[in-house]
Design a protein with these regions (language model features):
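An N-terminal hydrophobic leader/cap segment in hydrolases
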Residues: 1-13, 22
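Short, surface-exposed "cap/lid" segments of acyl-processing enzymes
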Residues: 15-103
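Structural motif
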Residues: 44-45, 135-137
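Alpha-helical interaction elements in eukaryotic regulators
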Residues: 55-62, 115-118, 122, 144
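Catalytic nucleophile-loop/oxyanion-hole region of alpha/beta-hydrolase
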Residues: 103-116
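Conserved acidic catalytic loop of the alpha/beta-hydrolase fold
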Residues: 117-136
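Gly/Ala-rich beta-loop-alpha elbow adjacent to hydrolase catalytic centers
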Residues: 139-144, 148
């Protein structure tokens, strides 16, 4: 069976600061994403914390390949009821803010953030934005692995 794996990129407030987030999955309509925040079901969430330069787009191909492998494995073993979501959260100010967001939120596009600020930002993302799931896997690349361990 063929699955269409899509990627959606949004700007969301995390700890009052605008953050670019991408989510990859097979069903990314607004209604579905709102529904899945409240209903755990057979959801598996994979959170990717990037290394530098901290851009979510760098992991788009990686996330799609992971989901494709998981879906093919589920099909092979006869388990087609899991709903996988692959989230990647950018680091603060590592992605250019859109013009319409530059003067809103708690930070400005020229603010600098220390490593501890970035770690707190990822914790805030998990608490505020990441949907609940049966299983959550956290992956980190380079400095993202360090943040994950903190």
């Amino acid at each position: 069976m063929l699955y269409e794996i899509n990627r959606r990129v949004d700007w969301v407030l995390v700890g009052g600061r605008w953050t670019r987030v991408s989510v990859i999955g097979t069903d990314l309509f607004n209604e579905t994403l709102d529904e899945i925040r409240d209903n755990i079901g057979n959801r598996v969430v994979i959170l990717m914390i990037p290394g530098n330069p901290g851009n979510d787009g760098f992991y788009a191909d990686f996330g799609q390949k992971i989901l494709k492998c998981l879906l093919l494995r589920d099909e092979r073993v006869g388990n087609r009821k899991r709903h996988y979501l692959f989230y990647t959260v950018s680091h603060l100010n590592h992605v250019v803010l859109p013009n319409e967001l530059k003067n809103s939120g708690k930070h400005r596009h020229y603010d600098l953030f220390k490593l501890d600020d970035q770690v707190q930002h990822k914790l805030d993302f998990v608490r505020e934005q990441l949907p609940m799931a049966q299983k959550v896997y956290i992956l980190g690349h380079s400095i993202g692995a360090y943040m994950m361990l903190r």
